[in-house]
């Protein structure tokens, strides 16, 4: 493979050569076994094409600062084709097997959808060649139904039939690409599938339309023989004020309302969880409990900032708890950990792209190590079992097994004094649990 970057391939070095980040992985050792599986199998890391190849590091108040070697190509198609080479070398040097992309990440649009598809197919042809050459894989692909001005009021939920038709045609071609590249999953993120005001919105009709749209998408996938897992990615707001896939619970309710729960799982992002007022681990738990945990977009936000900043993950506490949920789920099946993340605006060099991905991979690898030890020692399991132990016998078991009515429950407690009711409760020992979690993090990672 040609050398486009003056950086060495990232390998596992542990902490023996010092603690400064950047020379290799301190915690991510791809072939090391964790609970009987290689770390690389638990952590199917993926590089996001849009942030890595296309992101200019703009913010709402300033132009982009990113300095990228492919900027030397002035012709849009020439640059698009060159980016494929840069992307695959980046994957190789980062020791990452997977990548993800939107259709519009790959190639410039033409004046018509036919022209746009032709541009896209040229780039996909090259991607397929590089995949065959390198063995790299597509974790998931998706379509951008939010960037172009035609999607001013949404794609599948647009109040304009022509735009809904265009959205369907764009998804159709994107699904055909998914089959060509053997994409393991196909993601729907409703960037503008929501509303700004109820004053001009038929909310019920829009949700019925997007449900119909999803059924049609699945029907077409079946028709062409594409078998990848369909995923929905929740987000509460931005760019719209109210998005229909607000959070995991709302999205699951939507899927069940419209009979889509057998065809879809969830792709959950850390920063989106914050915007919804939840922790990342909460969203993962909700999906896991529903049997609909599909994949993870590994990023984080700033809890002091109220918008989506897509920062590379560095919070070991959060990573540990998310990995704990993933292990409890038995892994992510066809899903993985896609870095839907970008360096900070002041981190504008190519070196920063390598360092940021290294940091994110090490953070989740460290979290996986701690989570595995927590599970092995049954730290939380034993506490939870004891906390709910009153439902194993007596009136609790009767309640659990549907053997009592409200009247019988009333008879049981009607004459119990307050002192007995208080005595039946137990301390949650939350401070002790949080401190224990800290101790596991310090101890496991200190080895």
Curated annotation (Swiss-Prot):
Record text on subunit structure and interactions: Homotetramer.
Enzyme class: isomerase
Its EC number(s): 5.3.1.5
GO CC annotation terms, alphabetical: cytoplasm
Cofactor detail note: Binds 2 magnesium ions per subunit.
Intracellular or extracellular location(s): Cytoplasm
Catalytic reaction list: alpha-D-xylose = alpha-D-xylulofuranose
Residues reported in the UniProt entry to bind Mg(2+) 2: 269, 272, 308, 310
InterPro entries per record: Xyl_isomerase-like_sf, Xylose_isom_bac, Xylose_isomerase
Family as reported in the entry's similarity comment: Belongs to the xylose isomerase family.
GO biological process: D-xylose metabolic process
Cofactor(s) needed for function: Mg(2+)
Domain of life: Bacteria
Protein's name in the database: Xylose isomerase
Alphabetically ordered keywords of this record: Carbohydrate metabolism, Cytoplasm, Isomerase, Magnesium, Metal-binding, Xylose metabolism
GO molecular function annotations of the record: magnesium ion binding; xylose isomerase activity
């Amino acid at each position: 493979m040609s050398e486009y970057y003056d950086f060495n391939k990232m390998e596992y070095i542990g902490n023996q050569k010092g603690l400064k980040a950047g020379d290799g992985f301190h915690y991510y050792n791809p072939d090391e076994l964790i609970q009987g599986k290689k770390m690389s199998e638990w952590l199917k890391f993926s590089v996001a094409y849009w942030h890595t190849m296309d992101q200019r590091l703009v913010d709402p108040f300033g132009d982009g600062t990113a300095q990228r070697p492919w900027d030397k190509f002035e012709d849009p198609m020439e640059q698009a084709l060159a980016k494929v080479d840069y992307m695959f070398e980046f994957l190789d040097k980062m020791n990452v097997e997977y990548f993800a992309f939107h259709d519009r990440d790959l190639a410039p649009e033409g004046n018509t959808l036919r022209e746009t598809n032709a541009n896209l197919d040229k780039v996909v042809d090259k991607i397929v060649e590089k995949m065959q050459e390198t063995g790299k894989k597509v974790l998931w692909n998706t379509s951008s139904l939010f960037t172009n001005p035609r999607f001013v009021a949404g794609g599948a939920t647009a109040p304009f039939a022509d735009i809904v038709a265009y959205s369907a045609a764009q998804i159709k071609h994107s699904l055909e690409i998914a089959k060509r590249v053997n994409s393991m999953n196909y993601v729907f993120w409703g960037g503008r599938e929501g509303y700004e005001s109820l004053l001009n919105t038929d909310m019920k009709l829009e949700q019925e339309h997007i449900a119909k749209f999803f059924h049609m998408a699945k029907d077409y996938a079946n028709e062409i023989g594409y078998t990848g897992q369909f995923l929905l990615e929740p987000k509460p707001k931005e760019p719209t004020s109210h998005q229909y896939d607000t959070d995991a619970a709302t999205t699951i309710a939507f899927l069940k309302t419209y009979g889509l729960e057998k065809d879809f799982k969830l792709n959950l992002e850390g920063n989106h969880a914050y915007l919804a007022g939840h922790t990342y681990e909460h969203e993962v738990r909700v999906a896991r409990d529903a049997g609909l945990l599909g994949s993870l977009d590994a990023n984080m936000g700033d809890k002091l900032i109220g918008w989506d900043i897509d920062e590379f993950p560095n919070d070991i506490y959060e990573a540990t708890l998310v990995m704990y949920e993933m292990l409890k789920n038995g892994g992510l099946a066809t899903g993985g950990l896609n870095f839907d993340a970008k360096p900070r605006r002041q981190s504008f060099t190519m070196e920063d792209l390598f360092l940021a991905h290294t940091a994110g991979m090490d953070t989740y690898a460290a979290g996986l190590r701690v989570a595995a030890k927590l599970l092995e020692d049954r730290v939380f399991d034993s506490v939870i079992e004891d906390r709910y132990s009153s439902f194993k016998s007596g009136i609790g078991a009767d309640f659990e097994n549907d053997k009592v009515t409200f009247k019988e429950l009333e008879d049981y407690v009607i004459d119990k004094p307050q002192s007995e009711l208080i005595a039946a409760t137990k301390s949650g020992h939350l401070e002790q649990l949080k401190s224990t979690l800290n101790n596991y993090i310090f101890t496991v990672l200190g080895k």
